[in-house]
Amino acid sequence: MESIYDFVVQKNNGESYKLEQYKGDVMLIVNTASECGFTPQFEGLQKLYDEYKDQRFIILGFPCNQFGGQEPGSGEEAAQNCKINYGVTFPIHEKVDVKGDNQHPLFHFLTNAAKGMINEKIKWNFTKFLIDREGNVIKRFSPQKKPEQIKTEIEKLL
């Protein structure tokens, strides 16, 4: 069976790397958009990151333009927007598709690994996947779930 650590992702500068560099970390993987009603969640996500990063907690943002065309720019533009408007310092990657024919393999894995949670395709921006230190998908959160509402779930894994 494949592991989350086998996946290769692209930074917003086009450089590729394997997720195995986060082995032993608690990860929160989020599909993001700069022009979405949920975009203010970047502020809450950054607060979570600031609070827990010293305990080996990482947030990985993956911009996506599949929902309402709310991420029209490049991954680099998305990252700049996040930094300028919300002070985001966690990694924002290159744009990906999170569903459909061109679905990024990581999001295929996440969606399937979340069986029994919400085993269905991602329906909107800011769907969040919580991964434990061993690489298991522990929980999937809907876009409506605000970052501060998932603190307890994160703390259980730290």
Curated annotation (Swiss-Prot):
CDD domains: GSH_Peroxidase (cd00340)
Record key words, sorted: Oxidoreductase, Peroxidase
Pfam families: GSHPx
Active-site residues from the entry: 36
PROSITE patterns: GLUTATHIONE_PEROXID_2, GLUTATHIONE_PEROXID_3
Record has Oxidoreductase as a keyword: yes
GO biological process: cellular response to oxidative stress
SUPFAM superfamilies referenced in this protein's UniProt entry, alphabetically: Thioredoxin-like
UniProt superkingdom: Bacteria
InterPro entries: Glutathione_peroxidase, GPX_CS, Thioredoxin-like_sf
EC numbers: 1.-.-.-
Listed GO MF terms: peroxidase activity
Protein family according to the UniProt entry: Belongs to the glutathione peroxidase family.
Designated name of the protein: Glutathione peroxidase homolog BsaA
Organism: Staphylococcus epidermidis (strain ATCC 12228 / FDA PCI 1200)
